[in-house]
Amino acid sequence: KHKEKNALRLHFTMDDNLALDASIKARYESMYSGVFYQRYIKGLWVLAEGVIYQAFTKESIVPTVPRDYSKYIVSMDYGIQNPTAMLLFGLCDGVWYQVDEFYHSGRETGQQKTDEEYYQDLCELVGDLPVRELIIDPSASSFIALVRKSNRFKVRKANNDVLDGIQHTSTIIQERKLLVNDCCTRTIQEYGLYSWQEKTSNGQDKPIKENDHAMDA
């Protein structure tokens, strides 16, 4: 194809860079998995297909036990018709643990919740833990206004770049800097189901918009 298009095709990998020693190459190789490993390490522009978080295995799931967390945050995917997911994370010895989760689907339960009810669910999830901030989609304007009015949580609006988020999450899973307590059953289920679309009209990488509410959080 490159001859037909009068294009020059170059392929190289880290092994072609003589300035990189073995330890640096090993570190970079350990950072990626799945499609990102094939692209960034092997230099192969392969299609994004299959399960997105291939590095998430049974070793990524840990017992729900007390730990000496130094910091807590909550990340939230807010939905009205779609499910709402809240994920509680704690930092311990340089590793982020998903400590607990909240998940509610109005469609599944037949019960839609108000902003006030979701705020109560957030407070129950957190309890008396010193949660520093809530990370949430900027489009959840009414809920953000309610949280700010309560003056308990600092709000940080999430970056909605999906591919950057997937790449970052893939890296920290691969490096075992993100682990999930076994009580977070919805999240664990989504890690096993969250997949790439087989083909998009413009050739862009996109996840299937299913089994993605904990993933979006």
Task: For the regions a language model picked out, list residue spans one by one.
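Conserved beta-strand scaffold positions in the cores of enzyme catalytic domains, especially
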Residues: A7-H11, I73, V155
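Hydrophobic residues at beta-strand termini and immediately following loops
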Residues: L10-F12, I41, V99, A158
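A residue-level signal for conserved active-site and pocket-lining positions in enzyme catalytic cores
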Residues: F12, I41, M86, L134, ...
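Mg2+-dependent endonuclease catalytic cores in nucleic-acid-processing enzymes, primarily RNase H-like
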Residues: C92-K209
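Charge-patterned, long linear interaction tracts outside catalytic cores
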Residues: I208-A217
